[in-house]
């Protein structure tokens, strides 16, 4: 048996097309074009690439994108004042603060400074709390994108044993809440977990977001399981690989996401989806 590929690239393209169509409809109705402000501090190469992709996505769907490229020495106060200004700008529906930030800046305080109804990354404690209380508003982009990928498989998640490998605030923890909402029995594994292979082997659904190439071996995967690989790691030869050993997982899994072309495109598409939602539902 060879796994069905979950093509995040194609699903994300379809989602962007739907968003672009809705933007056209809004203009025809005389409604405001959604606006996204993207803040980049410093010159981290990976962050620059991510931000350029997000800006291109905005252009593709017809959003108004505001770019704020700030020097590495930008102060906490200056960044706070910029966020306050964008919070008060009625043309801005979403504010994205690209992480990681330079070491002298307090990311937690800055993310909390973003108004919850403009927190299109879904990182604000208010939005995480809404998700925990089963009344999600703006949902964290990567877990939200993964839920869309899972829906595309047509599989019923109710009652599934789901294992998440990685307990970060950005993916692992909110992913656990999303899967609880979907009716899964959820186990979260982390660096202190004993017998990781055993946990993975009992899972009907595995979401791996540990940032460690090849951490999950293909032979651990239960026959027919759904495997979602969030990891994206560049090897010395320049090749991008995930946290799952793809070649050996492929013949065992029922469904699997490739790296690249799986989760990454969906994270970006869900940022656009959240921005449109903010414009339509929260900033009428």
From Swiss-Prot:
Keywords: Amino-acid biosynthesis, Histidine biosynthesis, Hydrolase, Methionine biosynthesis, Multifunctional enzyme, NADP, One-carbon metabolism, Oxidoreductase, Purine biosynthesis
Pfam families xref list: THF_DHG_CYH, THF_DHG_CYH_C
BP GO terms, sorted: L-histidine biosynthetic process; methionine biosynthetic process; purine nucleotide biosynthetic process; tetrahydrofolate interconversion
Record-listed E.C. numbers: 1.5.1.5, 3.5.4.9
GO CC list: cytosol
Reactions accelerated catalytically: (6R)-5,10-methylene-5,6,7,8-tetrahydrofolate + NADP(+) = (6R)-5,10-methenyltetrahydrofolate + NADPH; (6R)-5,10-methenyltetrahydrofolate + H2O = (6R)-10-formyltetrahydrofolate + H(+)
CDD domains: NAD_bind_m-THF_DH_Cyclohyd
Top-level taxon in the UniProt lineage: Bacteria
GO molecular function terms attached to this record: methenyltetrahydrofolate cyclohydrolase activity; methylenetetrahydrofolate dehydrogenase (NADP+) activity
Residues bound to NADP(+): 166-168, 232
Presence of the UniProt keyword Electron transport in the record: no
Involved pathway(s): One-carbon metabolism; tetrahydrofolate interconversion
Sequence similarity: Belongs to the tetrahydrofolate dehydrogenase/cyclohydrolase family.
Function (record text): Catalyzes the oxidation of 5,10-methylenetetrahydrofolate to 5,10-methenyltetrahydrofolate and then the hydrolysis of 5,10-methenyltetrahydrofolate to 10-formyltetrahydrofolate.
Subunit-level organization: Homodimer.
Protein's name according to its UniProt entry: Bifunctional protein FolD 2
